[in-house]
From Swiss-Prot:
GO molecular function terms listed in the Swiss-Prot or TrEMBL record: tRNA (guanine(26)-N2)-dimethyltransferase activity; tRNA binding
EC number: 2.1.1.216
Family to which the UniProt record says this protein belongs: Belongs to the class I-like SAM-binding methyltransferase superfamily. Trm1 family.
Classification via SUPFAM superfamilies: S-adenosyl-L-methionine-dependent methyltransferases (SSF53335)
Keywords, sorted A to Z: Methyltransferase, RNA-binding, S-adenosyl-L-methionine, Transferase, tRNA processing, tRNA-binding
Matches recorded under Gene3D superfamilies: N2,N2-dimethylguanosine tRNA methyltransferase, C-terminal domain, Vaccinia Virus protein VP39
GO biological process entries: tRNA N2-guanine methylation
Protein name: tRNA (guanine(26)-N(2))-dimethyltransferase
Domain annotation Trm1 methyltransferase: ranges: 4-376
Binding site for S-adenosyl-L-methionine: 36, 61, 78, 121-122
EC class: transferase
Gene: trm1
Species name: Thermococcus gammatolerans (strain DSM 15229 / JCM 11827 / EJ3)
C-alpha cells in the first residue's frame, strides 16, 4: 500500500495513494474535512472525557480528537487489518512513540491522555463497554442504523452521539423501499427531500433511544454535500424519552408546493411522509459556541468554508421545512425572483425569513404559504 502524508488540523496523517478514494484499501475522503472540523469543534465545546471513534479507517478523526481537544481517553476502532496497522503508524507519526500491542488492541499512554486502538467489530466493542463513553462518533459508509443499539448502550446516559449518514439516496426517496426497510419511514422526493431525510434520520434515532428510556436533544443537525450529520445529547429517563417521541410526526405536500406537518404518533390522513423529527435542528447556544471556537482555534479549521457554513446555520430560522422559490415559481406559474427580495418583503410584512443551508434557492419562514406566494408576485 503506497502512502502519502497529508495534514488536517493539527494531525499529520498517512493515507493511501489512489486514483479514486473508493479504490483505496483504507478509506480516506478529503471532502469530509469540514465534517471533521465541526466534529472537533463539537468535542471541544462539549468536553467529553472518553471519546470513541468507532469506524476509524485512517484514524484521522480520532487523531484530531487526540491532538485538538481536552478528551482524556480516545479510542479508535476498525475491523480492517490494513486500517488498524495504518492507525498505529499515524499514532507514531504524531506522538513519536510506538503503541504497545497485545491481543488485537494497541495502547499509547501519554502524560495527559490514554489512546487506544482496537482491531474488531464496532458493535462488539461497544457492547463490551457498557455506558463507558461520553461521546461516540459513528461515521460509517452508508447508514448508521446497524450501530445504533450498541452505541446507545455504550454511551453514558447523559452522553453525546455524533452520527453521519451517507445514504442520502435512501433517505431522500430515490430508494423508497430501502428507506422503509432501514428507517421504517416513508421518504419524500423533490425540494423538501434533504430536510425531510435528515428529520427521518433523527426520528429513527429517537425511536431507538426511547427503547432504553433515553430522550434526545438535537444540538446540531445539517445536510451538506453527500451526507447528513447529527450531534445529539442524550437525556435519561422515561419522561425525557416520551417528550422526544412527542416531537415525531408527519409531512404532507401538495402539487402547488404547499406543505403541512403535524406532530402525532400516527398520521391523521393518507399521503403522509414519515415518521420524522419535527423538533429543533439546532441548539442556538451550542452553535454560537462552535462559531466562537472557530475564531479562537484556527488550528482546528482545515476547510476554508467551515466558518462560513457555521455562520449560515447560526442565522438560519429553525422551523420545520422550507420553500424553494424556483419550485414555487414553476408550480404556480410565477417568475423567479431574487431570494433577497422575497426575504425583504416577508420582513416588511412582519414575518421572519432567512436563507437555509438546505438549498441556495430556498427560504425558511414562519409566513403562511399564501403570503409567501404573494411576496413572490410583488
Amino acid at each position: 500500500m503506497e502512502l502519502v502524508e497529508i495534514r488536517e488540523g493539527l494531525a499529520r496523517v498517512l493515507v493511501p495513494k489512489a486514483e479514486r478514494i473508493y479504490d483505496a484499501p483504507v478509506f480516506y475522503n478529503p471532502v469530509m474535512a469540514l465534517n471533521r472540523d465541526i466534529s472537533v469543534l463539537a468535542v471541544k465545546a462539549l468536553s467529553p472525557r472518553r471519546v470513541l471513534d468507532a469506524l476509524s479507517a485512517t484514524g484521522i478523526r480520532g487523531l484530531r480528537y487526540s491532538l485538538e481537544t481536552s478528551a482524556e481517553e480516545v479510542w479508535m476502532n476498525d475491523i480492517n487489518e490494513d486500517a488498524f496497522r495504518l492507525i498505529l503508524k499515524n499514532l507514531e507519526l504524531n506522538f513519536g512513540s510506538k503503541p504497545v500491542l497485545a491481543n488485537g488492541r494497541a495502547e499509547l499512554g501519554l502524560p495527559e491522555k490514554r489512546l487506544v486502538v482496537n482491531l474488531g467489530d464496532a458493535n462488539k466493542l461497544m457492547s463490551e463497554n457498557f455506558r463507558y463513553f461520553d461521546f461516540i462518533d459513528l461515521d460509517p459508509f452508508g447508514s448508521p442504523v446497524e450501530f445504533l443499539d450498541s452505541a446507545l448502550r455504550s454511551v453514558r446516559r447523559r452522553g453525546f452521539l455524533g452520527l453521519t449518514a451517507t445514504d442520502t439516496g435512501v433517505l431522500c426517496g430515490a430508494y423508497r423501499r430501502a428507506c422503509r426497510r432501514k428507517y421504517l419511514a416513508e421518504p419524500i422526493r423533490g425540494e423538501l427531500c434533504h430536510e425531510a431525510g435528515l428529520r427521518i434520520l433523527i426520528g429513527t434515532i429517537v425511536r431507538y433511544a426511547a427503547k432504553y428510556d433515553l430522550g434526545v436533544e438535537v444540538l446540531l443537525a445539517y445536510y451538506r454535500d453527500h451526507y447528513f450529520r447529527v450531534f445529539l445529547r442524550l437525556r435519561s429517563g422515561a419522561k425525557k424519552a416520551d417528550e422526544s417521541v412527542e416531537l415525531l410526526g408527519y409531512l404532507w405536500q401538495d402539487e402547488t408546493g404547499k406543505f403541512k406537518y403535524e406532530r402525532d404518533f400516527l398520521p391523521g390522513k393518507r399521503g403522509a411522509y414519515g415518521p420524522m423529527w419535527l423538533g429543533p435542528l439546532k441548539n442556538q447556544a451550542f452553535l454560537e459556541e462552535l462559531v466562537r471556537l472557530t475564531k479562537t482555534s484556527e488550528e482546528s479549521i482545515s476547510h476554508r468554508k467551515t466558518f462560513q457554513f457555521l455562520s449560515l446555520l447560526v442565522e438560519e430560522l429553525d422551523v420545520p421545512f422550507h420553500y424553494d422559490t424556483h419550485a414555487l415559481a414553476r408550480k404556480n406559474g410565477l417568475e423567479v425572483v431574487k431570494i433577497s427580495r422575497v426575504i425583504e418583503t416577508l420582513h416588511s410584512l412582519g414575518f421572519e425569513a432567512t436563507r437555509t443551508h438546505f438549498s441556495p434557492t430556498s427560504i425558511k419562514t414562519n409566513a403562511p404559504f399564501d403570503v409567501v406566494l404573494r411576496s413572490m408576485r410583488k
